[in-house]
Amino acid sequence: DITDKEIELVSDALRSGWITTGPKTKEFEKKLAEYIGNEKAVCLNSATAAMEMTLRVLGIGEGDEVIVPAYTYTATCSVICHVGAKPIIADVAKGRHEMDYDNLDRLVTEKTKAIMPVDLAGIICDYDKILKLAERNKDKFRPGNDIQKGFGRLIIVADSAHGFGAL
């Protein structure tokens, strides 16, 4: 339930004159960094914006491929298209909503830069299997810049918008 306290806090934020970033955002970023055990956190207006920013920082773009699950939200594929890369759709496992981990290897090519698993509806992907896939396909990985070279394998860009805080 939304209480009067929450309504008051939102009203205070709106009256402060800070429409986007500001003291409340900085306070939230600090608390979020502590919660996830990191030194810093950056908050954007959506997971869509965060995923696109991540792909751009990684230098993923024209001519690159990113593997995504067939069962996901449209933003998973649209951010890949926005940066000029090509989404490669991985089928889901029979009877589940997750990617079929056993059939991902055949999707990896020398153009594949990343895999973007989706923690849909709070169901966390099997990141151990995904990491093993990335390690197994190191020989196909062709880094396009120093950041990608630093990974030395397929980059895992987790879309955890639905899985944030899930264990």
Model-derived regions: residue spans:
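PLP-dependent aminotransferase-like
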Residues: 56-160, 165
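N-terminal start-of-chain detector that recognizes signal peptides
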Residues: 12-16, 88, 167
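Conserved PLP-binding active-site segment in aminotransferase class I/II-type PLP enzymes
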Residues: 1-57, 61, 130
